[in-house]
């Protein structure tokens, strides 16, 4: 059996990395396809992070057009669709592994479905509240196995009409990654010094995570 892991940005790599590590440890055959933001210098060229984590990226699909607005983004997705079809024809994976709610993952799910390639979807059934949420649920309609991270997502998938035997309540893989990631915890001292947080353990604090709204990219600063 061969698994093909598909990833388009740093944001979903944390979902995929711990699963890939299990595949690596158990000698399960897999390939990685990296596309979109992973290959762009303007977004940090996060392909290097994948390679730094010890994984070889066999397939790269350059899809992004200059300009980065709604129209170039949409046209880029169709470029991806054509290239990913060729990849599946060459690679012939037994399963496609997708994560999250990004547009490129939606395109990959459509291609996989129409080439009769089974799809497993990580963190299916969650709510994003914008077009990303629509993409997530659309991916779910093409997927054959749904990995839910929490009971609410599990119940939502059932309400969306998915068969119970296809839904697995497994938790969020990035939390496993965070818990076992020695690089993060070994660097806590330097992180506290850099951001003047030496006394963090002695007081209450609130951690705020910012996530831009896809439809409002012009307002993002």
Residue positions per predicted region:
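N-terminal Rossmann-like NAD(P)+-binding domain of SDR-like oxidoreductases, especially those catalyzing
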Residues: 1
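Conserved nucleotide-sugar phosphate-binding/catalytic loop shared by glycosyltransferases and other
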Residues: 29-73, 83
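Charged helix-capping and loop-helix junction motifs
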Residues: 133, 220-221
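Active-site and donor-binding regions of nucleotide-sugar-utilizing enzymes
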Residues: 4-26, 63-164, 175
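Residue-level signal for short, function-critical loop segments
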Residues: 9, 36-38, 125, 212-213
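A nucleotide-sugar donor-handling region in carbohydrate enzymes
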Residues: 39-44, 143-219
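Structural beta-sheet core signal
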Residues: 5, 32-34, 121, 169, ...
């Amino acid at each position: 059996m061969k698994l093909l892991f598909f990833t388009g940005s740093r944001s979903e790599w944390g979902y995929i990395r711990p699963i890939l590590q299990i595949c690596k440890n158990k000698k399960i055959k897999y390939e990685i396809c990296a596309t979109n933001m992973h290959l762009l210098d303007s977004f940090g060229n996060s392909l290097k992070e994948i390679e730094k984590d010890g994984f070889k990226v066999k397939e790269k699909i350059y899809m992004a057009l200059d300009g980065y607005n709604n129209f170039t983004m949409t046209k880029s997705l169709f470029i991806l669709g054509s290239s990913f079809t060729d990849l599946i024809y060459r690679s012939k994976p037994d399963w496609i592994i997708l994560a999250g709610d990004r547009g490129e993952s939606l395109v990959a799910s459509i291609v996989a479905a129409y080439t009769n390639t089974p799809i497993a979807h990580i963190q299916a059934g969650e709510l994003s509240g914008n077009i990303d949420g629509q993409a997530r649920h659309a991916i779910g309609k093409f997927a054959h196995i749904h990995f839910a991270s929490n009971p609410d997502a599990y119940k939502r998938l059932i309400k969306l009409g998915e068969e119970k035997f296809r839904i697995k309540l497994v938790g969020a893989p990035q939390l496993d990654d965070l818990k076992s990631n020695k690089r993060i915890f070994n660097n806590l001292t330097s992180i506290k010094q850099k951001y003047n947080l030496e006394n963090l353990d002695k007081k209450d604090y609130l951690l705020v995570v910012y996530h831009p709204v896809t439809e409002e990219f012009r307002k993002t600063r």
